[in-house]
Every structure is written in structure tokens, then in C-alpha cells.
């Protein structure tokens, strides 16, 4: 029997990249062969993102393109994985696809694929699991990479009114910490230089033996048996002292002093925190069901700067949320002016089916107003990024070389501890080397320097 080939196309966040690596491992172990060529695949899997309307439209367009490429070949399976799976539960209404699998059901993919080719059984699985973290699966990663994603938890309990994640990925469940440590050590032996610990809300990580976090009862277990994020972060730092460690994403409501002190203590933990604020308006934060106020957020920012003075800060900002007015928008700009983030991810709000905002709030800010406000936010962030980057000029930064610059093949690019991109002449080094670079120039997006010997 000829072994079937599968092709995976990935959209969305770093978690989706990690999930695609898990799916590749599951399929490889069942005898399927991965290909990077869509046209030679029997199985085409699209790992989807539904965080914004624009993402979904892009994916649906891509599926139509794939259908055109394969024509009417009924022997090719097209499957949807990830966050859009919940939208395709009634597969009979969607002639574009043959298979639908949600984030907690990836172990079932081989059987579902076999069902399709045998023309029997089910081609869909979107149920949530109370325990699934794929802790026993070593992801099938691309060769010659130096950075690896390590998922430490799945799902989210925060129920922000704008966010679809609890409905697409389920509730919070944390992975066995000892499987995380084992994977990190494995990656070090394989030659990886950096790991990124992933979760929808890493600071909410809590291991007490497994299961949903919302089922946890503090009185039923000894405190020393509990491993929270600060303890996990320290365990990882100690276990792989020669690897760089990053993590994302954090929620301001859950970040503790203990986490900050661990970041400060260990040199191999990068001095960068991604701390989404979403809005600088308390009124909008309340409508979003964020558990922090603007004042809480500023106190946390001040604490970070006090404990880790050179810590780089980034955030997510949503503009044009339901009922947002000019005063709310200006308060967001004011917060940005106070923090002066190194960089930010900035988006226009779009209604997500299934969320509280979709059901109960009106998306009443015009698109033109959203676009204008987003432009103002982006322009201000560019000013702040340039301001932050200027401060690096004259300094010597420890850089991990990540690749060749896309703008000049004679230059490498890499990142410092603060996650800032740095470009510099190649010389006699290679991708994966740690080097020192003296910064002599910058733009709002990039630091420019020379190798310092």
C-alpha cells in the first residue's frame, strides 16, 4: 500500500505553529509522510485562526484557491484544524472541506483520515477534553531551526467579551511540568538555542496533578505539591542554563512578583514581557471584561521597571471596540505615552461569533473611525519604538543569530534579550551563534550594529 502524503498550511499564532508540529508527529507515527509540496499531497490540512474576521476571510479564500488547484479530485482530502473548527461542525453544509478537527482532538486525525478514504464513519471531531495537553508527544519540528515552541498550557478561563479563544480552545488546563522539562532538555541536546513557553495565559499555569484549572481546590492539596508559573519558569531556567527562555502570553491580572523576581534572577530568561492591555480606558476595559483597570496596569508596569529596570515591554491594543468614543481612544494614547512600549500588536476590533460582545454589545464604531484611530495608534507606536531603539545606540548587546537579512544577504539578523531585531555584517559566524554586537544606528523597527570582539 502506498503511504499517503500530508501537507499542513498554518495560520495564526505561535500556538498554532506548535499544534501543527504536534499533528505532524501524530501522522508520522501512523505512517503518513509529510510533504512541503501541496500538489503532491493526498491530505491537505489547514490549521486555522479565528481571532479576527480578516483572518477567517483569508483562510476561506485560501481554501477556495486550493479547491481550484486540485480541481475535482475526490481522492484528495481537505481538512480544517484549529480555531475555525467550531464553525464547521455541520460539515454537510460546507462543500469546501472533508474533515474538521478541533484543538483537543488531534489524536483522532489518523482514524478520521482513514474513514474518509474508506468512505465510512465520521470525518469530524470538535469536542473539548478536560485533560488533553499532548504532553507525551514530541512535536515534529522543522530541521535547522534554532528556536522551538513548547506549549505549557491550553485554553483560557478569562472570558474577555471580545475573545473567541475559550469557545475555540476550551478552558484552561496545564501540562505536566516534568514533561515540559524533559522536552526542553531534549531540545537542548538536539541543538536548539532558544525555547518559547506558550500558553493563552502563561501566568495562569497551575499544575496540581492534571485537569481543568477551574476544578482546582487549594484545600485538597499541599502547597508544596503545586507548581505555578514562577516555579515552572525557574525549573526550566535551571534545567537548560545554556538556552534562552522566552514566554508568551501574559495577562496583567495574573502576573505575580514571583515571576518578575525569577526573570531578574536568571540570566538565561530574556528580559522581555508581552503584556496585552487592549485599551487605556477603564470604561472599555470593563466592557471587555478585563480584570484589571488602567491604574492596576500602570502599577504593574512600574513594578516591572523597578524589579527589572532594562525589561523590554510590548502589548496588544484593540481599537474601535463596542461603544468606544474619542475620550476612550485618547486615554489609550495617553497610556501608550506613559509606558512607551518597545513594540505593539495593534488591531481593529471585529465581532466574533459566540462571544459575549457578539451576543450583547453593538459593533457601533464605524470602519472609517476604526481605521483612523488605528493609524494614530500605529504612528504613536512608531515614535515610541524609535525612542526606545535610540537608547540602545552605543550599547553592546548579546545577540542570538537567527538568519540572513531579507534586505541584504551580506547581513545577519538576530534578537537581543529584549526581543528587539538587530542586523549586522555576517563575518565568520553562523546561524545559532551567540555574539556581541555594538549598536550604532536604528530605525523604529530595527537596531543596526557591528560585531563586537
From Swiss-Prot:
<comment type="similarity">
    <text>Belongs to the methylthiotransferase family. MiaB subfamily.</text>
</comment>
<keyword id="KW-0411">Iron-sulfur</keyword>
<dbReference type="InterPro" id="IPR007197">
    <property type="entry name" value="rSAM"/>
</dbReference>
<feature type="domain" description="Radical SAM core">
    <location>
        <begin position="142"/>
        <end position="388"/>
    </location>
</feature>
<keyword id="KW-0963">Cytoplasm</keyword>
<dbReference type="InterPro" id="IPR006463">
    <property type="entry name" value="MiaB_methiolase"/>
</dbReference>
<keyword id="KW-0819">tRNA processing</keyword>
<feature type="binding site">
    <location>
        <position position="83"/>
    </location>
    <ligand>
        <name>[4Fe-4S] cluster 1</name>
    </ligand>
</feature>
<keyword id="KW-0808">Transferase</keyword>
<feature type="binding site">
    <location>
        <position position="160"/>
    </location>
    <ligand>
        <name>[4Fe-4S] cluster 2</name>
    </ligand>
</feature>
<feature type="binding site">
    <location>
        <position position="163"/>
    </location>
    <ligand>
        <name>[4Fe-4S] cluster 2</name>
    </ligand>
</feature>
<dbReference type="InterPro" id="IPR038135">
    <property type="entry name" value="Methylthiotransferase_N_sf"/>
</dbReference>
<dbReference type="GO" id="GO:0046872">
    <property type="term" value="F:metal ion binding"/>
</dbReference>
<dbReference type="InterPro" id="IPR023404">
    <property type="entry name" value="rSAM_horseshoe"/>
</dbReference>
<protein>
    <recommendedName>
        <fullName>tRNA-2-methylthio-N(6)-dimethylallyladenosine synthase</fullName>
        <ecNumber>2.8.4.3</ecNumber>
    </recommendedName>
</protein>
<dbReference type="Pfam" id="PF01938">
    <property type="entry name" value="TRAM"/>
</dbReference>
<dbReference type="InterPro" id="IPR002792">
    <property type="entry name" value="TRAM_dom"/>
</dbReference>
<keyword id="KW-0479">Metal-binding</keyword>
<keyword id="KW-0004">4Fe-4S</keyword>
<feature type="domain" description="TRAM">
    <location>
        <begin position="390"/>
        <end position="453"/>
    </location>
</feature>
<dbReference type="InterPro" id="IPR006638">
    <property type="entry name" value="Elp3/MiaA/NifB-like_rSAM"/>
</dbReference>
<feature type="binding site">
    <location>
        <position position="49"/>
    </location>
    <ligand>
        <name>[4Fe-4S] cluster 1</name>
    </ligand>
</feature>
<feature type="binding site">
    <location>
        <position position="156"/>
    </location>
    <ligand>
        <name>[4Fe-4S] cluster 2</name>
    </ligand>
</feature>
<dbReference type="Pfam" id="PF04055">
    <property type="entry name" value="Radical_SAM"/>
</dbReference>
<dbReference type="InterPro" id="IPR005839">
    <property type="entry name" value="Methylthiotransferase"/>
</dbReference>
<keyword id="KW-0949">S-adenosyl-L-methionine</keyword>
<feature type="binding site">
    <location>
        <position position="13"/>
    </location>
    <ligand>
        <name>[4Fe-4S] cluster 1</name>
    </ligand>
</feature>
<comment type="subunit">
    <text>Monomer.</text>
</comment>
<dbReference type="InterPro" id="IPR020612">
    <property type="entry name" value="Methylthiotransferase_CS"/>
</dbReference>
<dbReference type="GO" id="GO:0005829">
    <property type="term" value="C:cytosol"/>
</dbReference>
<dbReference type="InterPro" id="IPR013848">
    <property type="entry name" value="Methylthiotransferase_N"/>
</dbReference>
<feature type="domain" description="MTTase N-terminal">
    <location>
        <begin position="4"/>
        <end position="118"/>
    </location>
</feature>
<comment type="function">
    <text>Catalyzes the methylthiolation of N6-(dimethylallyl)adenosine (i(6)A), leading to the formation of 2-methylthio-N6-(dimethylallyl)adenosine (ms(2)i(6)A) at position 37 in tRNAs that read codons beginning with uridine.</text>
</comment>
<keyword id="KW-0408">Iron</keyword>
<dbReference type="GO" id="GO:0035597">
    <property type="term" value="F:N6-isopentenyladenosine methylthiotransferase activity"/>
</dbReference>
<dbReference type="GO" id="GO:0051539">
    <property type="term" value="F:4 iron, 4 sulfur cluster binding"/>
</dbReference>
<dbReference type="Pfam" id="PF00919">
    <property type="entry name" value="UPF0004"/>
</dbReference>
Amino acid at each position: 500500500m502506498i503511504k499517503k502524503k500530508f501537507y499542513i498550511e498554518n495560520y495564526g499564532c505561535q500556538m498554532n505553529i506548535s499544534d501543527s508540529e504536534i499533528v505532524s508527529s501524530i501522522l508520522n507515527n501512523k505512517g503518513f509522510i509529510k510533504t512541503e509540496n501541496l500538489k503532491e499531497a493526498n491530505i491537505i490540512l489547514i490549521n486555522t485562526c479565528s481571532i479576527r474576521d480578516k483572518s477567517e476571510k483569508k483562510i476561506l479564500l485560501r481554501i477556495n484557491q486550493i479547491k481550484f488547484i486540485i480541481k475535482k479530485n475526490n481522492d484528495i482530502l481537505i481538512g480544517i484544524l484549529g480555531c475555525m473548527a467550531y464553525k464547521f461542525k455541520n460539515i454537510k453544509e460546507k462543500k469546501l472541506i472533508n474533515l474538521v478537527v478541533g484543538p483537543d482532538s488531534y489524536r483522532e486525525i489518523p482514524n478520521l483520515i482513514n474513514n474518509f478514504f474508506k468512505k465510512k464513519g465520521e470525518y469530524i471531531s470538535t469536542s473539548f477534553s478536560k485533560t488533553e495537553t499532548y504532553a507525551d508527544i514530541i512535536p515534529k519540528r522543522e530541521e535547522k531551526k534554532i528556536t522551538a515552541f513548547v506549549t505549557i498550557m491550553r485554553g483560557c478561563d478569562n472570558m474577555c467579551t471580545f475573545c473567541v479563544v475559550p469557545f475555540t480552545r476550551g478552558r484552561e488546563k496545564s501540562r505536566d511540568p516534568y514533561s515540559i522539562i524533559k522536552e526542553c532538555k531534549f531540545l537542548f541536546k538536539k541543538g536548539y538555542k532558544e525555547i518559547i513557553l506558550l500558553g493563552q495565559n502563561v501566568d495562569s499555569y497551575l499544575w496540581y496533578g492534571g485537569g481543568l484549572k477551574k476544578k482546582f481546590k487549594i484545600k485538597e492539596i499541599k502547597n508544596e505539591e503545586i507548581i505555578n508559573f514562577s516555579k515552572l519558569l525557574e525549573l526550566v531556567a535551571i534545567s537548560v542554563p545554556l538556552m534562552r527562555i522566552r514566554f508568551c502570553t501574559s495577562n496583567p491580572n495574573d502576573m505575580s512578583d514571583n515571576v518578575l523576581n525569577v526573570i531578574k534572577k536568571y540570566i538565561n530568561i530574556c528580559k522581555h514581557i508581552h503584556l496585552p492591555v487592549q485599551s487605556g480606558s477603564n470604561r472599555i476595559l470593563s466592557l471587555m471584561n478585563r480584570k484589571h483597570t488602567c491604574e492596576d496596569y500602570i502599577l504593574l508596569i512600574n513594578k516591572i521597571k523597578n524589579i527589572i529596570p532594562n525589561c523590554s515591554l510590548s502589548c496588544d491594543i484593540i481599537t474601535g471596540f463596542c461603544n468606544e468614543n474619542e475620550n476612550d481612544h485618547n486615554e489609550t494614547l495617553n497610556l501608550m505615552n506613559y509606558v512607551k512600549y518597545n513594540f505593539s500588536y495593534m488591531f481593529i476590533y471585529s465581532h466574533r461569533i459566540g462571544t459575549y460582545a457578539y451576543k450583547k454589545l453593538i459593533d457601533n464604531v464605524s470602519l472609517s473611525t476604526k481605521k483612523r484611530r488605528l493609524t494614530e495608534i500605529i504612528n504613536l507606536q512608531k515614535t515610541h519604538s524609535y525612542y526606545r531603539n535610540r537608547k540602545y545606540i552605543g550599547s553592546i548587546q548579546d545577540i542570538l543569530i537567527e538568519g540572513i537579512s531579507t534586505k541584504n544577504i551580506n547581513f545577519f539578523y538576530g534578537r537581543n534579550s529584549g526581543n528587539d531585531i538587530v542586523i549586522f555584517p555576517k563575518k565568520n559566524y553562523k546561524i545559532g551563534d551567540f555574539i556581541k554586537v555594538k549598536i550604532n544606528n536604528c530605525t523604529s523597527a530595527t537596531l543596526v550594529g557591528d560585531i563586537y570582539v
